[in-house]
């Protein structure tokens, strides 16, 4: 029903599933993603938070925080789901810091240095071996924070690159850019993701944008796909940073020096958005719930612009619009100079 854009019928079907199986977590979770897709965020997060029964799922002997006062208390915020999900919801950690006596963030290893180098007012760890359950009054999934806090509003940027890292990449890019607009690119996500076929673009199709003049194309694509960039022609206008992107702290150092990031729905897009960097996100006809429907702006990331497929599976028209917008941006930059 959703793919046929029959939203009223879809809502009725979701509610029917919840009524038939009120204890079925998947039914409540699905209703939550439906409301989030429609932009009904507060309602959506409340239902989305029912995706797991944390008392049963969390393996440490710490009470799960359900909301409410944290005054004088210590709380463990733990990671859940993918890198993009965590980058999205780390925006709410500062609010918890203001509420609690002590905060510890348990995060995936590739994100840890990014947080530590920001010198945050909380502890960062990457393993349960670093934790003692007796130290904490409460625990809460980072991805549950939107459902527990009184407002979804948060300050952006909330992530940034360490100054030393930023300066290292400034020097590297300065040698290559020669006055060109510096644009970072990501065209493919994790191939193991259930929606990857829908969200990723083949490099052969994506590289058509490289015909736009006045741009230094900076490769932020990691994994198997990065080899395609290395094999591309016109080396004078291509800068391959991917081989040095060992973690998100390194990627943040590159992004901090770019004029724009163009990406499909991946963790890099979340990182750029969280840093307040101008980001153009390329979305399939049926996007993930957080990008909502039809709008070109983004509630979560003010500096992000959404380019959506208008025909299912057709990226060519999207890339044409992006190329046109890029040409305008280059011309505007040249006029200013």
Task: Briefly describe each language-model feature range.
Residues 1-260, 265-337:
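Alpha-helical solenoid repeat scaffolds of the TPR/TPR-like class and their adjacent stem/linker regions
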């Amino acid at each position: 029903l959703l793919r046929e854009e029959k939203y009223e019928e879809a809502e009725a079907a979701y509610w029917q599933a919840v009524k038939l199986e009120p204890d079925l977590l998947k039914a409540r979770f699905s209703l939550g993603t439906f409301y989030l897709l429609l932009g009904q965020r507060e309602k959506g997060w409340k239902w989305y938070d029912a995706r797991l029964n944390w008392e049963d799922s969390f393996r440490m002997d710490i009470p799960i925080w359900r909301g409410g006062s944290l005054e004088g208390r210590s709380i463990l915020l733990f990671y859940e789901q993918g890198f993009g999900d965590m980058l999205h919801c780390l925006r709410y950690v500062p609010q918890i810091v203001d509420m609690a006596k002590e905060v510890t963030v348990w995060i995936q290893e590739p994100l840890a240095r990014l947080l530590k180098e920001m010198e945050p007012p909380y502890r960062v760890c990457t393993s349960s071996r670093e934790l003692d359950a007796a130290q904490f009054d409460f625990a809460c999934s980072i991805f549950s924070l939107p459902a527990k806090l009184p407002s979804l509003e948060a300050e952006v940027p909330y992530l940034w690159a360490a100054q030393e890292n930023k300066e290292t990449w400034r020097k590297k890019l300065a040698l290559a850019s020669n006055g060109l607009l510096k644009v970072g690119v990501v065209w493919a996500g994790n191939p193991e993701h259930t929606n990857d076929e829908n969200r990723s673009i083949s490099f052969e199709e994506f590289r058509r944008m490289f015909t736009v003049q006045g741009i230094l194309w900076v490769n932020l694509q990691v994994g198997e796909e990065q080899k395609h960039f290395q094999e591309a022609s016109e080396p004078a206008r291509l800068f391959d940073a991917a081989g040095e992107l060992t973690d998100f702290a390194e990627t943040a150092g590159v992004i901090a020096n770019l004029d724009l990031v163009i990406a499909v729905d991946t963790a890099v897009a979340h990182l750029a958005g969280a840093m307040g960097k101008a980001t153009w996100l390329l979305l399939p006809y049926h996007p993930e719930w957080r990008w909502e429907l039809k709008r070109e702006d983004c509630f979560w990331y003010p500096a992000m612009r959404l380019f959506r497929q208008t025909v299912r599976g057709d990226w060519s028209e999207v890339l044409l619009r992006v190329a046109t917008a890029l040409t305008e941006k280059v011309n505007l930059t040249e006029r200013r100079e």
